[in-house]
């Protein structure tokens, strides 16, 4: 039978490189005190990286240079949201970048949230959590939320065949079907785009 320490290590290895996490992701395994001690020990030994207070990751390695890559901002945001029990949705330009619809990383990385306004430094960047009314967050979940935010940012006239194909390749068949289902109750043009994205799905 695995020790609590080994169970925590096993879960981190299961997360894989790039995944951000906090003590809250292990509360089903051990006490908070033991988790904190274990994570601090792993960080000190170099097995994981301390991104900021209470937030860690197993860094990805640059295959060409061999050094550690910067923390994944989206992973960090999601780990913070899990810890705080917030619902978050990437806003506009950042959503478009995450989906590959834009190569430009926005100067300000914003997530809509049902939590409070907050700014969290991560490396050389900052994550801005922007409180949104419940009505604005209603129905926005998973990939659907990401796609809708990106489409709203780009606009109807900015969506062409190449954008459709990029979105099509980034979604699983199940996600495409869910996108069409959820988009039915939203803006008409977004629903039409959703149908085009899913039309080749079996």
Annotated model-derived regions:
Residues 51-54, 84-123:
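Short gly/ser-rich loop at a beta-strand->alpha-helix junction or flexible surface loop bordering the NTP-binding
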């Amino acid at each position: 039978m695995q020790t609590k320490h080994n169970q925590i290590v096993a879960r981190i290895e299961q997360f894989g490189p790039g995944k951000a996490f906090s003590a809250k992701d292990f509360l089903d395994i051990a006490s908070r005190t033991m988790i904190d001690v274990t994570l601090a020990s792993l960080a000190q030994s170099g097995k994981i990286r301390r991104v900021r207070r209470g937030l860690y990751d197993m860094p990805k390695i640059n295959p060409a240079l061999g050094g550690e890559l910067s923390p994944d901002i989206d992973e960090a945001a999601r780990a913070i949201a899990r810890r705080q029990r917030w619902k978050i949705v990437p806003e506009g330009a950042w959503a478009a970048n995450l989906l590959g619809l834009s190569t430009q990383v926005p100067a300000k990385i914003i997530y809509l949230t049902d939590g409070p306004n907050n700014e969290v430094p991560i490396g050389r960047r900052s994550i801005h959590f922007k409180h949104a009314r419940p009505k604005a967050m209603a129905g926005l979940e998973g990939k659907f939320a990401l796609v809708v935010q990106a489409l709203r940012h780009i606009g109807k006239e900015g969506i062409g065949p190449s954008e459709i194909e990029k979105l099509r390749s980034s979604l699983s068949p199940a996600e495409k079907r869910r996108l069409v289902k959820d988009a039915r109750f939203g803006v008409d043009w977004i629903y039409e785009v959703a149908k085009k994205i899913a039309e080749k799905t079996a």
